[in-house]
Amino acid sequence: MIIGTRGSQLALAQAETVARLLKAKGVETSLKIIKTSGDRFTDRPLHAVSSGVGAFVRELDEVMLEGKIDIAVHSMKDMPTIRPPTLPTVAVLKRDTPFDLLLTYDGTPLDELSEQSIIGTSSLRRAAQIKRYRPDLVTQDLRGNIDTRLRKLKEGKYDGILLAKAGLERMGWELEGEILSPDFFCPSPNQGTIAVVTRAETEAEAAVSRLDHTDSRIATEIERILISELGGGCTTPIGSYAEIMPDRKKLHVRAEVLSLDGEETVGINEFIPMAGGIEKARELGSSLVHMGGKKLADEALMQLSRDSCDSNDLHE
């Protein structure tokens, strides 16, 4: 079976993880690298690449529908909420660390960084959360693979950079940094999770379904439901995180929408029962909308649309 993947080091590491798990189940695979729009246009912010929605996913969907690959491997946080019905997410792998990590030039923690320190990130959510937590800091866009980002930090172009902890774990890199609390830095929905997609009703679907991790699927589904009515795609300042409690009777759920400047926030932070958790998550998602979350998300999209037009003018 052919596994389609992006060509970055991280994407290849994730695809190789899936290949290894399938081989343990007796399924032989090969990798096929697909270049996505998110990979091609690294000279502009991610939100300026086809509005950022599905920038790392769309081309893999297309080649799968054409029958050129059997399996696609994604960072689940990059996947749009609305998916083609013929391309189900057949397996959600066991989740890695879902939190953000701050790496600083000289090891200084976030609370001790000097005013006007420059923080690099490609995520509008992380940028907004930093502005809310430390409005005296400066955020700048940071694109490129993990190697490139770390090199720019070492060169002193940034005082700190924000990354997903899971990405470093999958690369096998142990770097000392500060894990940011989800109470202040609610992660992107499904962060730290690998999703595996196939065409429906195929041999690949049957094989891949054996890799599904039930608890991770439950948590990621709750996270998507919480923010499903907000719109905005995976690039707007939206966080969502669901954690199954040790007693397995409750989930701790957090979700928030921020303005791009971090000055406004609408959020929830509650415990909900596992039984009926899907319906309760829908209720909380509706509450986010009525509290003004949809308005904030729409305003962010409008601003991003204007910025994208300006950016595209520069690249014509």
Curated annotation (Swiss-Prot):
It catalyses: 4 porphobilinogen + H2O = hydroxymethylbilane + 4 NH4(+). Its cofactor is dipyrromethane. Tetrapolymerization of the monopyrrole PBG into the hydroxymethylbilane pre-uroporphyrinogen in several discrete steps. The modification S-(dipyrrolylmethanemethyl)cysteine is found at residue 234. Binds 1 dipyrromethane group covalently. One of its GO terms (biological process) is protoporphyrinogen IX biosynthetic process. Gene3D superfamilies: Periplasmic binding protein-like II (3.40.190.10), Porphobilinogen deaminase, C-terminal domain (3.30.160.40). This is Probable porphobilinogen deaminase. Pfam families: Porphobil_deam, Porphobil_deamC. Belongs to the HMBS family. HAMAP family: Porphobil_deam (MF_00260). Keywords: Porphyrin biosynthesis, Transferase. The keyword Chloroplast does not apply. Coiled coil: none annotated. Its EC number is 2.5.1.61. Pathway: Porphyrin-containing compound metabolism; protoporphyrin-IX biosynthesis; coproporphyrinogen-III from 5-aminolevulinate: step 2/4. The porphobilinogen subunits are added to the dipyrromethane group. One of its GO terms (molecular function) is hydroxymethylbilane synthase activity. GO terms for cellular component: cytoplasm.
